[in-house]
């Protein structure tokens, strides 16, 4: 069962530039490292999340793969170094999982 994992980070709106500059470094890290899952980044315009949020999402084959990715992020030094710089701008983090529905016959 395919699963979409979303990591939603609400950041301090007065620090949007600094937060996004660090997020660009995360995107560069994904491109540089083939072991990193490549996520799609979204910022709400009109949604259930505030406009000062960044959503990273990726589709996984199953929920186990999604959980393994969270473990990977937590254990990767480059990721942790960047996250430690970004964490001061983050007000809230949520992680959501969605089952991908496929009604093809």
State where each predicted segment sits.
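Short amphipathic alpha-helical segments
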Residues: 15-41, 74, 78-82
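Functionally constrained cores in energy, signaling, and assembly domains
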Residues: 2, 6-9, 23, 30, ...
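Glycine-rich beta-strand-turn "strand-cap" elements at beta-sheet edges
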Residues: 37-55, 78-105
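Short acidic, gly/pro-rich beta-turn/loop elements at beta-sheet edges
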Residues: 17-19, 66-68, 105
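A short, structured loop/turn motif at beta-sheet edges
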Residues: 13-15, 32, 61-63, 102
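Short, well-ordered beta-strand segments in beta-rich or mixed alpha/beta enzyme
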Residues: 3-10, 39-74
